[in-house]
C-alpha cells in the first residue's frame, strides 16, 4: 500500500525553517519518499485560504479565528553563551548580573519599559521576575544573532531546540542553571473546517515526534535546575513530608 504522495506545501518563519525544520526534512523524506516538499519561508502571515499552502508552521498564539491550530511542541528558552565568551567575561551566577554582560536580544523575548529593557526569567520554584539587560544588539529574528553568539560576542536567550545542535558539539553552553525564559508554543495551523489530508497528517505527526524528542534531549542535558539545586529541593520536600506525617500521627495518637 502506497503512502502519501505529491507536493506538500508549507510555510514557516525563516529562523525556524533553518534551525528547526530543515535538519529534519531528510528523515521525513526517507520515511515518505513519494512526497515532495515546497517550503515557503516568510516572517509574514500567509493567506492559507486563498493560497496553495497546505499548512503553516507558526510560533505563539493564534489571533485569527478563521484558523485552527494543532500544538506541535512547547520549547523552553534559556540563556546560552559560547565557551569563549564565558572564559573571557565570566559566567553570570544570578540574573541580576546580566546587566553587566554583553547581551544579544530577540525583540519578542524581552520587555521594554520606559527606562530599561528586561528579560522575564523564572526560577526553579516558579517565581518570575524581570531582570535588566543592556543589549549591544537586538533583532527581530534569532538567526541574526546566533552567529555572533557562537563567535563569542555575548549571551542570548534562545529556545532549546535552536541551541541543541550547538550544545551537542560544545559550541554553546547554558548559563544561569535553574532559570528559564518564556516558553514558546510551536503550532501547525490550518483553515477552520478543512479536512487534514494524509500528507499533512503525516508531516504534522512526524514533527510532533521529532520536536518532542529534541525537547526531551535538552530537558536531560540542560535541566531547569542544576543537579545540586534539584537534590536540595527534593531533600527539602522530603523533610516537609516527614514533618507532615509526624503531625498527622500526633493528631491520631493524641
Regions found by a protein language model. Give the residues of each.
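Short, well-ordered beta-strand segments
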Residues: 9-11, 56, 104, 156, ...
Amino acid at each position: 500500500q502506497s503512502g502519501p504522495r505529491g507536493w506538500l506545501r508549507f510555510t514557516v518563519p525563516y529562523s525556524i525553517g533553518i534551525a528547526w525544520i530543515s535538519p529534519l526534512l531528510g528523515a521525513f523524506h526517507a520515511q515518505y519518499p513519494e512526497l515532495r516538499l515546497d517550503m515557503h519561508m516568510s516572517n509574514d502571515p500567509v493567506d492559507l485560504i486563498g493560497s496553495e499552502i497546505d499548512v503553516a508552521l507558526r510560533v505563539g498564539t493564534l489571533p485569527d479565528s478563521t484558523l485552527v491550530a494543532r500544538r506541535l511542541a512547547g520549547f523552553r528558552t534559556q540563556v546560552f553563551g559560547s565557551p569563549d565568551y564565558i572564559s573571557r567575561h565570566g559566567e553570570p551566577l544570578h540574573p541580576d548580573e546580566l546587566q553587566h554582560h554583553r547581551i544579544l536580544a530577540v525583540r519578542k523575548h524581552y520587555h521594554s519599559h520606559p527606562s530599561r529593557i528586561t528579560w522575564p526569567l523564572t526560577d526553579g520554584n516558579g517565581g518570575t521576575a524581570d531582570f535588566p539587560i543592556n543589549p549591544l544588539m537586538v533583532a527581530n529574528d534569532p538567526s541574526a544573532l546566533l552567529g555572533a553568539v557562537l563567535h563569542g560576542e555575548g549571551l542570548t536567550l534562545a529556545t532549546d531546540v535552536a541551541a541543541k545542535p550547538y550544545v551537542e558539539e560544545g559550541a554553546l553552553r547554558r548559563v544561569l542553571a535553574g532559570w528559564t525564559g518564556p516558553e514558546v508554543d510551536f503550532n501547525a495551523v490550518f483553515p477552520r473546517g478543512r479536512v487534514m489530508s494524509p500528507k499533512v497528517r503525516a508531516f504534522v505527526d512526524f514533527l510532533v515526534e521529532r520536536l518532542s524528542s529534541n525537547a526531551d534531549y535538552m530537558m536531560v542535558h540542560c535541566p531547569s535546575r542544576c543537579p545540586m539545586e534539584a537534590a536540595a529541593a527534593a531533600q527539602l520536600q522530603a523533610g516537609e513530608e516527614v514533618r507532615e506525617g509526624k503531625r498527622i500521627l500526633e493528631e491520631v495518637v493524641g
